[in-house]
């Protein structure tokens, strides 16, 4: 799976989980500030991403992921390992 495929899959997950249009989920859109996610939304996002990619995101790493690009970068490293 290449980075573009990961980007599109995560973009869809974020859009569905937060109930926002995919066009709003840009690579730099902050989950909380730009997309209106609260702490529960963020936990649910992490769980959905873990399930979709069959990976585990440690709590300390999850706290550092606040936008789509950061999520894609983390997932790319995990699936490449």
UniProtKB/Swiss-Prot annotation:
Post-translational modification as stated in the protein's UniProt record: 4'-phosphopantetheine is transferred from CoA to a specific serine of apo-ACP by AcpS. This modification is essential for activity because fatty acids are bound in thioester linkage to the sulfhydryl of the prosthetic group.
Post-translational modification O-(pantetheine 4'-phosphoryl)serine, affected residues: 39
Subcellular localization(s) per the UniProt record: Plastid, Chloroplast
Annotated GO CC locations: chloroplast; cytosol; membrane
Highest taxon in the source lineage: Eukaryota
GO molecular function list: acyl binding; acyl carrier activity
Pathway per the UniProt entry: Lipid metabolism; fatty acid biosynthesis
Assigned keywords, A-Z: Chloroplast, Fatty acid biosynthesis, Fatty acid metabolism, Lipid biosynthesis, Lipid metabolism, Phosphopantetheine, Phosphoprotein, Plastid
One Gene Ontology term from the biological process aspect of the record: lipid A biosynthetic process
Listed PROSITE patterns: CARRIER (PS50075), PHOSPHOPANTETHEINE (PS00012)
Function according to Swiss-Prot or TrEMBL: Carrier of the growing fatty acid chain in fatty acid biosynthesis.
Protein name: Acyl carrier protein
Organism: Guillardia theta
Lineage, uppermost ranks: Eukaryota, Cryptophyceae, Pyrenomonadales, Geminigeraceae, Guillardia
Name of the gene encoding the protein in the UniProt record: acpP
